[in-house]
């Protein structure tokens, strides 16, 4: 068996100490015995990934990682697999998080500019290859032994965990302090423009030593982000203020582009020309060890389809009483959400019974999506309803009901007069309403 034997993995990597772990993966320090190079190995539990419905996403993301070879991006060296595990062999970045520096005090302007230049060049490189990060945050900004910035988790977001450290700049798990207004809004967004916003928040933090959008009241902080309400400290010079106003523009259509940022005089001061000249075409593809059961990515026994896992921001955005879209635009009233302490199988069974009673054709899709369709056309065609189940914890789920076709009034009538009463036994709370009991769900 090619899997880990003792301290050796694939007869090539000497495994070291555990560096961290999350829901799907553990990360170990390791040494390549052929080159003596220090690496990090992310060991992923294939069964958990399959149950979470994330295998296709991981395979797509492995392919995109071939496109993102850049000196300021944590490198994926190799992908291997066995019948039970997937292994990502990654560059080991030894300098820790950039924000550990900021916790000791704000950075001088030249130092902040250097890191911002490296960040922008790395992110722009990925954008040029059609890859967007969408989750730039403190944990993803690392430093190597030469104090150069390294952006991590490009292309590996499916395995990102929401666990964060407490501290000056690490906000509560899921707090969208670095997230663009349009992402909070959940109405679809341009990945490039969302990344630009996050880069602006990071620049502010480097120069100020604190977040631009912060409030003890979470909802007030959401509002500040939505309106881009922030104040620059007195030590910010005019050029930085102007640049930040262009980056932290709540309207993505008028927000500054990467090209314009890179033309900005403040940005270009002292810029290392090698960053701009970096060859965008990688010379080598990432080696994938096909002899170690990579083809068995899909060969595991058939598993019950489980609902999608929500990341922490999704939980906050979708959970009871926190419908954020109303802060930015009028709701079209086509969707409703409720939370439940029932198991996923119980929720699915209940929805199947409701669909049968309403004579709706029900189709199960991957990741906890149930599609229902009427048998007869109504005023605006055949009514279509999606029910999507998200796992917050094994004992707590969020369900989103959404009209996908047909007349809105007809849908609201079916929802309020038929579906809601039938769902009452499994509903903990409908979004915007108080839970039927004050008992908190088990997390």
Swiss-Prot record:
Q: Where is the active site?
A: 135 (proton acceptor)
Supply the induction statement.
By drought stress and abscisic acid (ABA).
User: Which SUPFAM superfamilies does this chain map to?
Assistant: Protein kinase-like (PK-like)
One family from Pfam that matches here is: Pkinase
Q: Which reaction does it catalyse?
A: L-seryl-[protein] + ATP = O-phospho-L-seryl-[protein] + ADP + H(+); L-threonyl-[protein] + ATP = O-phospho-L-threonyl-[protein] + ADP + H(+)
Which cofactors are reported in the record for this sequence? Mn(2+)
Protein name, as recorded: CBL-interacting protein kinase 2
* Species this protein is from: Oryza sativa subsp. japonica
């Amino acid at each position: 068996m090619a899997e880990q034997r003792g301290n050796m993995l694939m007869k090539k990597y000497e495994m070291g100490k555990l560096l961290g772990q999350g829901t799907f993966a553990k990360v170990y320090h390791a040494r390549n015995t052929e080159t003596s190079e220090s690496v990090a190995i992310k060991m992923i539990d294939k069964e958990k990934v399959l149950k979470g419905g994330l295998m296709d996403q991981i395979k797509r993301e492995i392919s995109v990682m071939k496109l993102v070879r850049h000196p300021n991006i944590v490198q994926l060296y190799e992908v291997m697999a066995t019948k039970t595990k997937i292994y990502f062999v990654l560059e080991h970045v030894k300098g820790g998080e950039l924000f550990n520096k900021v916790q000791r005090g704000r950075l001088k302007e030249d130092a902040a500019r250097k890191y911002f230049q490296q960040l922008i060049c790395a992110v722009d490189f990925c954008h040029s290859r059609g890859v967007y990060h969408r989750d730039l945050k403190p944990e993803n900004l690392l430093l190597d032994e030469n104090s150069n910035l390294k952006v991590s988790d490009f292309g590996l977001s499916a395995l990102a965990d929401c666990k964060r450290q407490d501290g000056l700049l690490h906000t509560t798990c899921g707090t969208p302090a670095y997230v663009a207004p349009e992402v909070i809004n959940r109405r679809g967004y341009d990945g490039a423009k969302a990344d630009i916003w996050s880069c602006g928040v990071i620049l502010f933090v480097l120069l100020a030593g604190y977040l631009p959008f912060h409030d003890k009241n979470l909802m007030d902080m959401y509002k500040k982000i939505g309106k881009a309400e922030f104040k620059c400290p007195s030590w910010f010079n005019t050029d930085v203020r102007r640049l930040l106003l262009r980056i932290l523009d709540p309207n993505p259509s008028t927000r500054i582009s990467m090209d314009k940022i890179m033309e900005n005089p403040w940005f270009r001061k002292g810029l290392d020309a090698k960053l701009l000249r970096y060859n965008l075409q990688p010379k080598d593809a990432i080696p994938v060890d096909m002899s170690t059961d990579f083809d068995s990515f899909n060969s595991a026994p058939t598993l019950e389809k489980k609902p999608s896992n929500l990341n922490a921001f999704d939980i906050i955005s979708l959970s009871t009483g926190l419908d954020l879209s109303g802060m930015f635009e009028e709701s079209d009233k086509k969707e409703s959400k409720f939370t439940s302490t029932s198991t996923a199988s119980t929720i699915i069974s209940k929805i199947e019974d409701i669909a049968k009673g309403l004579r709706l054709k029900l189709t199960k899709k991957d990741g906890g999506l149930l599609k229902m369709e009427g048998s007869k056309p109504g005023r605006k065609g055949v009514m279509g309803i999606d029910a999507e189940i998200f796992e917050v914890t094994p004992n707590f789920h969020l369900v989103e009901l959404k009209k996908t076709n047909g007349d809105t009034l007809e849908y609201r009538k079916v929802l309020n007069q038929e579906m809601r009463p039938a769902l009452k036994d499994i509903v903990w709370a409908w979004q915007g309403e108080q839970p039927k009991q004050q008992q908190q769900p088990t997390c």
